Amino acid sequence: MDDKMVRLADIFVQSFFPLLKAGLIFTIPLTVLSFTFGLAVAFLTALARLSNIRLLSTAAKFYVWIIRGTPLLVQLFIIFFGLPSIGITLDAFISAVIGFTLSVGAYSSEIIRSAISSISRGQWEASQALGMSKAQSMLRIILPQAVRVAIPPLANSFISLLKDTSLAAAITVSEMFQISQQITARTYEPLLLYVEVALIYLIFSSILSMTQSRMEIKFARHV
């Protein structure tokens, strides 16, 4: 038993930094890039949903319906394994960024749309009474208020995305879960390695949660 515990402790220590390195080099950048691009897509999609132009509104609804109605893992498989059949071959990391970006764009667009819609119509009317155009009203009056409403759910989405990046292992991205599988193949200790990965994800998520709480307090002071 003592030899077993020593071996497990040795594996834990030796694997911790390779896993942490994978998290810092692949998992965190994948999360940040996907969320950044996803927010841009989400904002445009939300505006399209709120648009009076029926074609834009319908296209945005269709996009959100497709992404929210299909599993993220299937979407990643279509991008990485499916597109080569029509001559489009993408790097695994790029495929993951595209897949997660589309997912963030669809889900976060609903958050942004709801935040914008929550601002009273009187705000629009007051800004237009001051001679502002619709675009100026959106940028100067509506969006600053909508951001405060959207921050908490968007922060939750960011934390969820961090955990969802483990799915990228299925398309060979060398993030933490993929590295843990490689180490497991050598050590035959899946329980230890997967618990270790879960611990690192928990550390990352806890840091983000504390950051989120501080941001919410900061924004609450300015309401």
Where are these regions (language model features)?
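Transmembrane alpha-helices and adjacent helix-loop boundaries
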Residues: M1-V223
